[in-house]
A protein has these predicted regions:
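Conserved alpha-helix/loop element of class I SAM-dependent methyltransferases that forms part
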Residues: 24-45
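A short acidic, Gly/Pro-enriched loop at the edge of an enzyme's catalytic core
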Residues: 105, 109-120
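Class I S-adenosyl-L-methionine
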Residues: 163-203
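Conserved beta-strand signature within the Rossmann-like core of class I S-adenosyl-L-methionine
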Residues: 151-158
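Class I SAM-dependent methyltransferase SAM/SAH-binding core
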Residues: 50, 55-107
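A short glycine-rich, Lys/Arg-flanked "PGG" loop and its adjoining helix->strand segment in the class I
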Residues: 135-150
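A short SAM/SAH-binding and catalytic strip from SAM-dependent methyltransferases
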Residues: 118-134
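N-terminal, positively charged/glycine-rich alpha-helical extensions of SAM-dependent methyltransferases
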Residues: 1-20, 25-28
């Protein structure tokens, strides 16, 4: 049976013992995809970044190494956020980024409505949310749209090649990179994770 990725109880139990884990790809690999877009933002303004479902990833530390301190890490499990603070403090000696308890499918309840971001990222959080069905994923997308600044966009890494094939999605979607999955045998077929760039549509 698949894990109950959409249930908070699953993550509470998991994060009780898990201190660090990277979904689908290392933060370094994901950051290599994000970096050109981040550089484009930073040429015009300091970047305000929202990471959805930060879990026990160290992705936020990569943003800080790039000089980005206006980073808000969101997870609905407080234990995950404590792990994030620990990872930041271990790397830099202090904690300067934000860690906010919020449900990514109800962002308007967890973040002030006027809180806007130039860049929203998630590393397979969309896959966990999708376990609860299309309605939950659309709620997540609507919340992201509401919290994007003008010209802002969302970069999402997913195991699915059709993750955002949804009606009423408030975004135009483009696959900007594919990451090969590990093979058990050389003869295994090529399978890729998809990295999506989502920009608000005009509908």
């Amino acid at each position: 049976m698949p894990a109950d990725f959409e249930k908070q109880s699953y993550w509470h139990e998991r994060f009780a013992s898990e201190t660090s884990f990277e979904w689908l790809a290392s933060s370094q690999s994901f950051m290599s995809i994000i970096e050109p877009y981040l550089q484009a933002i930073c040429r015009e303004r300091p970047a305000s970044i929202l990471q959805l479902g930060s879990g026990t990833s160290d992705l936020q530390n990569y943003f800080r190494r790039k000089g980005c301190l206006d980073v808000t890490n969101v997870d609905y499990e407080p234990l995950a956020l404590e792990r994030g603070r620990q990872l930041e403090k271990a790397a830099f000696g202090d904690v300067r980024m934000k860690y906010v308890v919020a449900d990514v499918t109800q962002l308007d309840n967890g973040l002030p409505r006027d809180c806007k971001f130039n860049l929203v990222v998630d590393k397979s959080t969309v896959d966990a949310v999708s376990c609860a069905g299309e309605t939950a994923l659309l709620r997540m997308a609507t919340g992201v749209r509401n919290h994007l600044a003008d010209g802002g966009f969302w970069i999402s890494l997913s195991y699915s090649s059709a993750r955002f094939a949804l009606e009423q999605l408030p975004f135009d979607v483009e696959v900007v990179a594919k990451i090969p999955t590990p093979k058990l045998k050389a003869s295994d077929p090529d399978v890729y994770y998809s990295c999506y760039l989502l920009r608000p549509n005009m509908n």
